[in-house]
Design a protein with these regions (language model features):
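Extracytoplasmic entry segments of secretory-pathway proteins
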Residues: 1-140, 150, 233
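Extracellular/periplasmic metallocenter environments
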Residues: 18, 22-31, 123-233
Length: 233
């Protein structure tokens, strides 16, 4: 084979590989929009200190997906009040977020009790079923199911779980969960930055059952136990 023919063959092969890579990117990455983003910015002027209310729940399973044994979060739509399987939400810059998390999952001892300390919220407290607490010690009492942690804003919230044996033996079996199942109600507030940006949040309890060290699966998948808060101006 002559040199020009070999060069032409290599160019054709290179273009074919490039075309294949482009197809994969477009059809398998860009075509997938991922979980929706719930918008809490309507009728709120950014950077005025106004407040928005975000309601979430964590569930011990995800029966609305093809991974029913994965633990997950849901966000309640501010427009329809339906539970949406997503962990992405949008809030105004320079505002106060009043968050409520319904804790339907059972207790899991924290690997490191540092995740049981509340940080980054208004007053560095949360309200568990109406009771103000600054620490949940999962080593002395099985009282924590998951966490809501946003490292870039210094936020760490241990999400309380039902503590009784009876409650932990009768957890919600279909998601999204309903108030008839054992649960806790965790409330707290935090302030958003005045500068727009994307802030990653996740659960710090290794709850990916069946994955190495519990850190795979739902723990690293947007829409389950990790997500993004979009702060918009």
């Amino acid at each position: 084979m002559s040199l020009p023919v070999r060069v032409a063959t290599l160019i054709v092969a290179f273009l074919a590989v490039g075309a294949l890579a482009g197809f994969v990117v477009v059809h398998y990455f860009l075509a997938s929009s991922g979980p929706p983003v719930e918008d809490f910015t309507a009728h709120v002027t950014p950077d005025t200190g106004a407040s928005v209310s975000v309601v979430m729940q964590e569930a011990p399973q995800t029966t609305v997906t093809t991974d029913p044994d994965w633990v997950t979060y849901f966000i309640q739509s501010p427009q329809t009040h339906k539970w949406i399987h997503t962990t992405n939400f949008e809030v105004p810059a320079g505002s106060t977020v009043n968050m409520t998390i319904f804790g339907y999952d059972g207790c899991t001892p924290l690997r490191n009790q540092v995740w049981g300390k509340v940080t980054g919220t208004v007053g560095d407290v949360i309200y568990v079923d109406g009771r103000a607490v600054s620490v949940l010690n999962s080593w002395s009492e099985c009282s924590v199911a998951h966490t809501f942690a946003m490292p870039n804003l210094g936020i760490n919230v241990p999400v309380a779980s039902p503590t009784s044996f009876q409650a932990n033996s009768n957890l919600c079996s279909a998601s999204p969960c309903t108030p008839s199942s054992p649960h806790t109600v965790v409330k707290f507030s935090f302030r958003t930055p005045r500068t727009p940006g994307t802030f990653f949040w996740q659960c710090k309890i290794p709850c990916g059952l069946g994955f190495i060290d519990g850190n795979g699966g739902p723990m690293q998948t947007i829409g389950y136990m990790t997500g993004n808060m979009e702060v918009v101006g």
